[in-house]
Amino acid sequence: MEIGKKIINIIKLLFDDWQNKAISILIAILMFVAFNFNKIESITTEKEFKIILNDQIALGKIPDFSKIKITIKVNKDDLKYLDLNKIILFIEASSIKIPGSYKLPIKIKNLNSIHIAEYKLSKTNVLLNLDNKVSKLVKIEPKFKLIEKDGKGEYFIAKYNILPENLLVYGPEQELKKINTIQTNVKEFDTRTLFVSDYLEVVPPNPLVMFEKSHVVVNIYLNKKYSNTTIKSPNLIFNNLKNGLEIKDKEKIINSENKMFVKIKTRLSEKQIKAHINNQNISLAFDLADIKTPGIYNIAANIILKENINETEIYDYEPKKIKLEIIESSEIKP
């Protein structure tokens, strides 16, 4: 009987006035939720995401966006311990080994020691265009500018060399097919010394291409500028014409009215230049060794600098080719 009474009392305690008790419990739950909600702080920031690729695969195209907004909810008490740099956004694509287009989810990794109550991303997926990753050696085109403080323009770049001359580049196969040369950033040099050795920064043709090195070494040798001189009606030399053949109207070819000249950069004085011309040290030469029968031929011109004129540089000349009519020599005709 005692046990029965106790059970009845417990039932009365639980179910008597149950409506009021249910309301009290609901109010308690709401108060608990409201209390905890007020302790949650919401932070919105913009972050870049990383793309993890297989070693054999490269991005074939830059994604339409590289940053997304992320909303982070964390307990107010933990807020001071939150380091946003330790919230990592990434796309896991390391298992993909075949080029193509893939829509992949953006994943989140929390490296903070505190608990993050909730994450919310403005975008959850990214479309990636992937290509085969290849490499090749590409020639470097240096860009530099000579600055003279006094503005006299007395110096010029006599020669230079690049180390290395070619650079190994990596990137998507379709992009690397378009790349034959790589340029550097423009760098200015002054004329305080006649030899300059410095670094040039290599410029990526686009963000998809990576370099083995980011810099190359350039060695520049300066010299005083040459004076520019045009030698009109230079000496003409016809070499190796076979016996039994001759040039028709040779005297008309050498006619001073024809467009013939040699432009040189030189440190030589006008008197020295004239002496070289008179001594036929600067000439246009034509090699006729390949001509075996009479006919009309276009022969390429070559420059001959006799006596090794070290301080002379040829930068233009005419003609580049000359048309010759070769006939049988009159000396062997009956």
Curated annotation (Swiss-Prot):
Q: Which UniProt keywords apply?
A: Membrane, Repeat, Transmembrane, Transmembrane helix
Q: What is its main location?
A: membrane
Q: Name the domain of life.
A: Bacteria
Q: Which InterPro entries match?
A: c-di-AMP_regulator (IPR053154), YbbR (IPR012505)
The record's subcellular locations are: Membrane
Gene3D superfamilies membership? 2.170.120.30
Q: Please tell me one Gene Ontology term that the record gives under cellular component.
A: membrane
> Which protein, by its recorded name, is this?
YbbR-like domain-containing protein BB_0009
Native source organism of the sequence:
Borreliella burgdorferi (strain ATCC 35210 / DSM 4680 / CIP 102532 / B31)
